[in-house]
Regions:
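Beta-strand C-termini and the immediately following turn/loop, strongest in propeller blades
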Residues: 36-37, 56-57, 70, 75-81, ...
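A detector of repeated loop/turn-to-beta-strand junctions in beta-rich toroidal repeat architectures
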Residues: 40, 126-128, 169-171, 213-215, ...
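Multi-bladed beta-propeller domains
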Residues: 43-62, 86-106, 132-147, 175-191, ...
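Conserved beta-strand position repeated across blades of beta-propeller domains
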Residues: 67, 111, 152-154, 196, ...
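Residue-level detector of Asp-centered blade-edge/turn motifs that repeat once per structural unit
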Residues: 70-71, 114-115, 155-156, 199-200, ...
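Asp-box/WD-like beta-propeller blade repeats and closely related beta-sheet repeat scaffolds
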Residues: 104-109, 113, 117, 122-155
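Blade-level signature of beta-propeller repeat domains, shared across WD40, Kelch, NHL, RCC1
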Residues: 291-316
Length: 316
């Protein structure tokens, strides 16, 4: 029986990986790949008023994807399959592990609810979405199917948005926290990833390679009026994050010559850019070494005046 189970598992694994790009495999197996990196991680804060960024803490190991808690008191990040919180007023303090119960393979897709009471996360293979109390506890499964990679929680906390691998589709889907079925909002070819709700709950922002190039898109929360928002000739645009006041969107870009459209790899020269929520006044904020793990999820401060991200240095 065990041999048969293992054979079925290998066949399932083969069916998921066959024909996939490196970008797909990073989505499918983020912990396995990222654990091989030998880097120093720099947790940084970008200040929109001064247009400067400051390293608030260095780590001699890999950390990824900071969140900024709605009360402004905590940074939350993942490392080694666990979630940790760090006081924003004293980031040199000892990191506090968040008890995620049986979820011991947390990847870089985790989001804090707008009331700060719970955390949504994606956990280990085949990466399903779970929710846990912010103060810790046993996870509750939200998506029975995987792979599912969480990126957004609705402002009222009633549903989540995620990238779902379903057959040959890589779609943006949403699901309420009850037993309701999931709704897939995109049917376009390519990778549709990074869905995040606007603070007013009217829109979902995401990135898509449906045109053959990766750009930021926006749609109504019901999936209608899917609209391209970035048009860079030399950049692939990923992971749009809307500020709490709804005015700004920060996102990360790769140079087109460095990778394929649907790959978001680590250890690349990337840039963070800012535009208005109407797609105007687009500008570069900072160039850095990073990529995967830098700003996968929303990291805005609650006052919309700053956001957090991670840059990296290779160990020599």
């Amino acid at each position: 029986m065990n041999i048969l189970k293992k054979m079925r598992g290998l066949l399932s694994l083969f069916s998921l990986t066959k024909g996939r790009t490196v970008g797909d495999l990073l989505l499918l197996f983020p912990l396995t790949i990222m654990a091989q990196d030998d880097v120093i991680s720099c947790l940084e804060v970008y200040n929109l008023k001064t247009n400067t960024h400051t390293v608030v803490r260095e780590f001699d190991y890999k950390i990824e994807a900071p969140n900024w808690s709605p009360d402004g008191k905590w940074f939350v990040y993942n490392s080694g399959g666990r979630l940790f919180k760090l006081p924003t007023e004293n980031p040199s303090a000892e990191p506090i592990e968040i008890d995620t119960g049986s979820a011991k393979g947390c990847n870089n897709d985790h989001v804090i609810s707008s009331d700060g009471k719970w955390i949504g996360l994606s956990d280990k293979w085949p990466s399903k979405v779970f929710v846990v109390p912010f103060e810790g506890g046993e996870p509750r499964e939200v998506t029975p199917d995987g792979p599912s990679y969480l990126h957004g929680i609705s402002p009222d906390g009633s549903e989540v948005a995620y990238c779902a691998f379903r057959g040959d589709k890589r779609a943006v889907c949403t699901k309420r926290l009850d037993d309701s079925p999931e709704r897939c909002l995109t049917d376009a070819d390519g990778l549709n990833d990074g869905p995040e709700y606007s603070p007013d709950g009217r829109h979902i922002w995401f990135n898509s390679s449906r045109t053959g190039e990766m750009h930021v898109w926006r749609m109504n929360v019901d999936g209608t009026e899917q609209t391209q928002m970035t048009f860079h000739d030399s950049l692939y645009s990923w992971f749009p994050h809307v500020s709490p006041n709804g005015k700004w969107v920060v996102y990360i870009c790769y140079s087109k010559g460095d990778l394929k459209a649907d790959e978001h790899l680590p250890n690349k020269n990337v840039e963070l850019r800012l535009m208005t929520s109407k797609g105007k006044k687009d500008r570069q904020l900072v160039e850095l070494f990073g990529g995967q793990g830098t700003i996968n999820v929303n990291s805005w401060a609650p006052d919309s005046k700053a956001f957090a991200f991670v840059s990296y240095r290779l160990k020599r």
